[in-house]
A protein has these predicted regions:
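Bacterial N-terminal signal peptides that target proteins for export
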Residues: 2-10
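Boundary at the C-terminal end of the N-terminal hydrophobic targeting segment
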Residues: 22-24
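N-terminal, Lys/Arg-enriched amphipathic/low-complexity engagement segments
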Residues: 26-66
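Conserved ATP-binding subdomain of kinase catalytic cores across diverse folds
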Residues: 53-150
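Sec/Tat-exported extracytoplasmic proteins
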Residues: 82-84, 109-110, 168-174, 303-310, ...
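Conserved kinase catalytic-core segment
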Residues: 98-99, 104, 146-219
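C-terminal catalytic region of ATP-dependent kinase domains
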Residues: 188-320
């Protein structure tokens, strides 16, 4: 009888130890990936209409199966399966178009991003028919890990991270919470890579708030508004070799300490995007021809504004 009672706790302890070892082994595997935020690419040859998924990943809409409703975020989202068996998260509402364009613009510069497409009209069985739906891929071979933090990550102080921060002001992203960031485990050619992406870029192509007061800083914010983005302020001034931006509300502290040299690094990338590529990014997001023209012009003005702030344009071939 004594042995019987002794075996039970011993078995429980062994089970706990085995589970702990298994978890530790899994954790050690997860931290092994090479951290990647940005990579050198041939910017001028990137297809911003197809985007990071290209034509190969385009969703097959011949049939759609509803899986479940996603509870995160402010916009309504549904997890669905397309005719080819691929899984997607369908986002509805005002963030769908700007997010589709923003992903393509960042990817065009070499930043790692989610894979998404804008569908003009989509019927989800049991839920209804919706206009301008963003579909974000959930590939089976990509593992979604934890969020990453703006103030604590492997790229602090680098041109890549500082350039990404500038792009957040450039795109008027007023939702710079760490929970919008995600690490994606991808199998690269030379082993596993951890791609640091901004998973939610919906609060872009509009206007930032107009003050820093608690709660009230939300006043004036806009999303997916071409007219607002055209008139939105960007660079405020250069002071002591650092760029100061028009960025109000939460997260404004992360915009401090960005140098002129880091701004020039980003400008050299932006200058390699053609008008046609930029237009493709907005066309892929289903903006009208008139709005696309407006947005391309606004994009060019912002690039020139950055150029003036960081000094004369780079001569010769821009460095990647």
């Amino acid at each position: 009888m004594f042995i019987k009672y002794l075996i039970k706790p011993s078995f429980f302890i062994l089970l706990v130890l085995y589970s702990a070892i298994g978890y530790a082994q899994e954790a050690s595997t997860l931290v092994a990936g090479k951290a990647v935020l940005w990579e050198r690419v041939d910017i001028s040859s990137r297809d911003l209409f197809a985007g990071p998924g290209g034509t190969a990943m385009k969703p097959d809409l011949k049939s759609i199966e509803f899986i479940e409703e996603e509870k995160s975020g402010h916009n309504k989202k549904y997890r669905i399966e397309d005719a080819s068996g691929r899984i997607w998260v369908a986002k509805l509402g005002s963030e769908a178009q700007p997010e589709t364009a923003a992903v393509r613009l960042l990817w065009g510069l070499g930043y790692k991003t989610e894979i998404n497409y804008l569908v003009p009209s989509l019927t989800i069985p049991g839920k209804g028919t919706f206009e301008k739906v963003r579909l974000e891929a959930r590939p089976a071979g990509i593992k979604r890990l934890d969020e990453w933090k703006w103030r604590d990550n492997p790229f602090v102080g680098t041109n890549e991270l500082q350039g990404l921060k500038i792009m957040m002001v450039f795109l008027t992203n007023w939702d710079l919470l760490d929970l919008q960031n995600k690490v994606l485990r991808v199998e690269g050619q030379n082993g596993p890579e951890d791609h640091y992406v901004i998973s939610d870029l919906g609060a872009t192509v509009g206007k930032l708030g107009n003050n820093n007061l608690p709660v009230i800083f939300r006043i004036g914010r806009k999303t997916g508004d071409p007219d607002a983005w055209t008139n939105a302020r960007f660079v405020e001034r250069v002071k002591n070799g650092e760029l100061e931006f028009h960025f109000k509300g939460k997260g404004r502290d992360i915009m401090k300490g960005i140098t002129v040299e880091q701004g020039r690094w980003l400008f050299e990338k932006l200058a390699q995007l053609s008008d046609a590529q930029v237009a493709d990014a907005f066309r892929a997001a289903n903006y009208s021809p008139a709005d696309t023209d407006l947005l391309v012009a606004a994009f060019k003005r912002r690039v020139e504004e950055l150029n003036k702030a960081v000094g004369p344009a780079a001569t010769g071939k821009a460095k990647n």
